[in-house]
UniProtKB/Swiss-Prot annotation:
Keyword Transmembrane set for record: no
Entry protein name: L-lactate dehydrogenase C chain
Active site, UniProt feature: 193
Highest rank taxon of the organism: Eukaryota
Lineage of source species: Eukaryota, Metazoa, Chordata, Craniata, Vertebrata
Gene Ontology molecular function terms on file: L-lactate dehydrogenase activity
Amino acid sequence: MSTVKEQLIENLIEEDEVSQSKITIVGTGAVGMACAICILLKDLADELALVDVAVDKLKGETMDLQHGSLFFNTSKIVSGKDYSVSANSKIVIVTAGARQQEGESRLALVQRNVNIMKSIIPTIVQHSPDCKMLIVSNPVDILTYVAWKLSGLPATRVIGSGCNLDSARFRYLIGKKLGVHPTSCHGWIIGEHGDSSVPLWSGVNVAGVALKTLDPKLGTDSDKDQWKNIHKQVIGSAYEIIKLKGYTSWAIGLSVTDLVGSILKNLRRVHPVSTMVKGLYGIKEEIFLSIPCVLGRNGVSDIVKVNLNAEEEALFKKSANTLWNVQKDLTF
């Protein structure tokens, strides 16, 4: 006797099940799941795979998303502890790692998370050799370097989420001070995603009007409006949120989804993401820091050569030295 499905549906062709825009997220903690829901709501993937070693948590999160399938257009959500579920991904987002504790700097996390990367990165590449890898785990700049070394992929395809979120926070706070929406406030933060990040006050503008032309002291200690406090707030944001709710999630999830959209849709938008900066601004070491990069289907296709003033360049080099002093002693 035929089944209800056989009576209802007659199959006409055997379809190839290879996904065209598969995304894998490694790590189903707060950040990984924020990335997942944002990606689903933006309809960026035809298949979403989740990977984690915490099997019960993974199963629960997967079921929870699958039960919402009516409300988004991703046809397939899969998960597993085994990385075979990630096979043939276009983008692999790595959020796995030890969580930053209250008062702990991102750099203090480093060796713990380097050890985790050693068990993750080679397996990802084995199953998705053509993927673009997006590193989100902190300290993101150093871990992007580690992931690049472990993966054997071109540096252009191993990208750190970097200062994309720092710059978003920067623009939000500028907009809040001016009473203008963040999309109309333009400003960049480069360097480390962390305490040594560099605000490019020389380029901050609204509608092409550089704020520095209105007040040359903008962003300095002698600025009467205390714009410098905005950068201090950017640096302190994660610490404050972790103190208040235990972790950050939503803004980084939205930021990562923004990067994924630029890559998958080949938008060639410019983002401040962590990439190899050796040879730029006099930096001689293999270091990953955020600079404005063009993102498209091949990952980082171009970098924007920002004209830094003397103070900004000195701060960028200081940021590089801060990372190098930690990175040079890593073992992996």
